[in-house]
Amino acid sequence: MKKYKILLFVIVMSCISNVYMWGTTKPLSKNRIDLFSLSEVRITDKYFKHIQDLDHQYLLTLEPDRLLSWFRREAGLTPKAQPYPFWESEDVWGGGPLAGHILGFYMSSMSMMYQTTNDKMILDRLNYIVNELLLCQKAHGDGYLLATVNGKQVFEDMIDGDFTTSNPLINQTWEPVYIMNKIMLGLYGVYKRCHIQDAKRILMGMADWFGYEVLDKLNHEN
């Protein structure tokens, strides 16, 4: 028995030694790609700087309250402004408006422009948008946040198996997960690039709602 104990001790110590050695082993080659922030890059070429300035100016011409209009409406709050025309408020391919998707792209673009220019006006505007989205999410009361017209009902019908699809529509409504994806990506960019903590809070609430209220309730047939 004593011999077995000694053998077991030697094996254990050998394993610990190997783990330690593996943990301190250095890679044979260096990383071929080094990631860097947009804040570390500045455009000096006259032509490209002009294009960046035009983008910067255009982003600031868009009105947050118009981009937020459908979010407030779907949350039961009074919109502060009418939504933008065309895809944001008119019928698109028989699925109604593609409400809310522009705000997702807008948040992504604004967060990147902030890293590039450090313009405080952009940061102030993003803080306003995040605060408004947080109000909408709180009004729903369960983490849900979307501008899709009757979006929550679409998810409920899908869970019940009462739906038809005709890409990109579901129950004659623009597929809400697409729009949710754009909003979540925008919030992620705002959190990572601008360090606005409430953007992360909203994002986590949306993810929890989708996980618990949609994915957990779906079966293989759905």
Give the ranges of each region predicted by the language model.
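Glycan-recognition and catalytic cores of secretory/periplasmic carbohydrate-active enzymes
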Residues: 22-222
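Bacterial Sec-dependent N-terminal signal peptides
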Residues: 1-25
